[in-house]
């Protein structure tokens, strides 16, 4: 399912020492994002509901020699989110430079057969969770003239059969990102839209479905988590670019163009 590709080196000196909070950071794309920031010597707070985030934080800190803390939290719990954000910024004079909203889930099913629980869970985690973090963080980000990077999905752009809840949530993230940029000057907002990425989640898909999705890309391969991570870090590194307050970035192998 993978094709050998050359991984470029991404170096952004302006991110050294910056305070970065990443949700859904225990594994997959979230872990790759955290590792990429650690390479830039940023100070990290990793947030996840999965207890494995503790081991992830320890491994990244050991590998890259930077400060990596973690918290167990559900992004759907607004009170807990507020606590985590306050604990993140307290040691740094109430400053937050970068927020990455990566936490997300899928619960697939045909629209008219989808349970209320499956619909609500996906909207709550993927869209409301993003709002909860932004709401709790915005005043600290404005102080730092920082950056918000929201992880959306190509599914929020082109739609996908069996994922009406996920598509609605991720499409909502794109619109939410644009609206926040209109409301708040001094913070740069980006929505990154990954395509079919090589993670443990996609590895569980039946091979015929995986082949179908790959065939829809222009590059005829899956993406790697580091490709999303480098797009995130690149977007965050431009937080001082006041002439680009908002960007929607598709990192999907050309899926939006048709196979």
What function would you assign to each model-found segment?
Residues 139, 181-185:
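Alpha-helical segment proximal to the catalytic Tyr-Lys
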Residues 2-11, 158, 240, 245-259:
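Short C-terminal tail/terminal secondary-structure segment
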Residues 185-188, 193, 243-246:
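Short, small/polar-rich loop/turn modules that mediate ligand/substrate recognition or access, typified
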Residues 153:
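Residue(s) in the substrate-gating loop at a strand-loop-helix junction
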Residues 110-111, 115-120, 202, 213:
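Substrate-binding pocket helix/loop in short-chain dehydrogenase/reductase
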Residues 140-142, 221-251, 256:
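C-terminal substrate-recognition "lid" of short-chain dehydrogenase/reductases
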Residues 134, 169, 177:
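Active-site helix of classical SDR
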